[in-house]
Amino acid sequence: MTITGKTRVTGIIGWPVAHSLSPPMHNAAFEALGLDFAYVPFPVAPERLAAGIAGLAALGVVGFSVTIPHKVAILPLLDRIAPEAELIGAVNTVAVKEGILTGYNTDGIGLLSALRSKLGFQPEGRSVLVLGAGGAARSAVASLGLAGAGRVEVANRSLDAGRGLAETMGERLPGTVFGFQPLGRVSDKGYLSGFDLVVNTTSVGMAGDGFAGLDLSALKRGASVYDMVYAPLVTPLLAQAEVVGVPSANGLGMLAAQGEAAFRIWTGAVPPEGCMEKALAARLATPGNP
């Protein structure tokens, strides 16, 4: 990559951000299309967020990704917020055009794309169990509701968080039935048989741990499992799904698809099919990476 005075800059802000897999993913797509763009990590401490955002805009950055811990804190610093980002209550992508900063959330787009491409799953009228009630769960629940899911149930250790998420989405998306249960309910005999899809939005699996008592063999025929975790590529949840013959996929496809959506927002171009996911897989295969 050769950077000149004409190179258009994109990047990612977070704290920390050195571990991010987004730079190789986006730069691979820029290179494949011959676009004079570059994507770089910008470490921005929480107490410097406002100054950092103003600086990026002043320097003419085309846009940037937003990761932990800034996805919510950035909201009041933006000029406009896209409807889906407003519903989710978090932003992971910002476009800068003529000094106007517009916030988007492409996580939901990424999830829906991955569900369709990896599992052939269409949410319309289907029942989905979402494990967790944090930021990733919020984007999942919102996107599934917007896509017409018939029923979305949130299972979480903190019942208050699960209830709050379900009730909020129920008020905003009346076309979908939202419910909540304590996480321990997933081990109850027969409970899983009511769902077409199970989505893990938590960090469970990253350290080789699993969900106690969760028996995927109880899922009905044709049901699927999606795990947002992508490191390791095969979590205990996915390993169990393979053993019992349940179609499943890891979070790599979602990570690539949300990046593709951000790429389109910034450039107006479509990344070559599979380019970003291949770059991610290559980086993950490099020793010392997540």
Swiss-Prot record:
Annotated catalytic residues: 71 (proton acceptor)
Record flagged with keyword Amino-acid biosynthesis: yes
Q: Does the keyword Ion transport apply?
A: no
Name the catalysed reactions: shikimate + NADP(+) = 3-dehydroshikimate + NADPH + H(+)
Q: Which residues form the signal peptide?
A: none
- What would be one Gene Ontology cellular-component term for the protein? cytosol
Q: Which Gene3D superfamilies match?
A: Leucine Dehydrogenase, chain A, domain 1, NAD(P)-binding Rossmann-like Domain
| MF terms in GO | NADP binding; shikimate 3-dehydrogenase (NADP+) activity
**Which residues take part in binding shikimate?**
20-22, 67, 92, 107, 230
Does the entry annotate any disulfide bonds, and if so which pairs? none
Question: For this chain's UniProt record, which GO biological process terms are given?
Answer: amino acid biosynthetic process; aromatic amino acid family biosynthetic process; chorismate biosynthetic process; shikimate metabolic process
The pathway to which it is assigned is: Metabolic intermediate biosynthesis; chorismate biosynthesis; chorismate from D-erythrose 4-phosphate and phosphoenolpyruvate: step 4/7
Positions binding NADP(+) in this chain are 132-136, 228, 251
Function description: Involved in the biosynthesis of the chorismate, which leads to the biosynthesis of aromatic amino acids. Catalyzes the reversible NADPH linked reduction of 3-dehydroshikimate (DHSA) to yield shikimate (SA).
Family the UniProt entry places it in: Belongs to the shikimate dehydrogenase family.
**NCBIfam families according to UniProt:** aroE (TIGR00507)
Assembly information from the UniProt record: Homodimer.
Name of the protein described by the UniProt record: Shikimate dehydrogenase (NADP(+))
Q: Which organism is it from?
A: Geobacter sp. (strain M21)
